[in-house]
């Protein structure tokens, strides 16, 4: 039996009232009532503040974007000569940045602006580590309407805005066109996983003589990817990690979906699991297809061109229960630390809105494959140079909100990865593993949520 984290159950988490109503695609949890108790300045008070002369920006440089981030910082400093920005490498991924930001909370110096992933911004908000930025945005002359409505809506909580979208992405289906051609299958992404399962044995057979060839399909490395990308297979077969606040990881449909995943590796043998980076495996010609972030698009196409390899991209495949809206969004936003001075917070607001404006987001999108987050962004030049980018933009229209078990239960994503490791790498019994996962997620609720409930 699944646990239902209803509005009544979840009332009071860090002073927030979190509704369990269904969310629209690409939107944060619906909320009403009181928000997290943080004192913020009014628009009139912000107007009397002078921005600090120096701030820091902690990033993992998502999508290998460090050079682009440096260019954006230089452009910001040129437009705001009184403010300098110190770029801090917080780690090689979102989790490492989160750990460093959390550690900094114990000291007197915290970074002013932080890249916050889809599984971290909410925790920062309810813990009071970041500042609601509604009035800050007004103070620097920016409106939430300046952003893609679905992406900016991801960061709405307790009737307040907690972040702006930055390096936002969706997974894409990447495939080697030459491998598909050799197998005599269509040079396109499969419409469903069932269709790909029909193609896969032929694809593997036709390309197995290639040096270092492994599999027709490579599941992404489990750490950081399993909880995110496996939602696609689950949703396509009518399953999920959770439905709103109900944990459904061991429902009949979820078990069937994950059994299909295990069978593709163990019984049918046309799929494998990457030990490090599935997109690198694809670029090396070791596999014929994989799923990876749209942020990998530019680098993958560049590598393919250099290797005289034809790489195609497409929507994520559907399944027997759903053929569309089976793609999650992902990536990160920018948050402003609550522990710094108003002067630094105002300078931070100037910076985050500059690096997410139409010109800046277009530059980041062109360099990586991340989604343009500004409503006024003109992607025509990107599509002209990289036609595959249109797929990224088009797929955004049919995305689905991620399961709460991954994004809003503290540590939930790591637990999903542990379960996936057992199922995909250790050949564990699927049903019992997912039942154990459900119990673990319930335990997270009991330990990390229930103690904070209001009496």
Task: Show where each model-derived region lies.
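N-terminal secretory signal peptides and thylakoid transit peptides that target proteins
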Residues: 1-18
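Long, aromatic- and glycine/proline-rich binding clefts that accommodate carbohydrate-like moieties
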Residues: 150, 154, 314-315, 366-418, ...
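Glycine-centered hinge/linker elements that transmit conformational signals in sensory
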Residues: 199-204, 244-272, 316
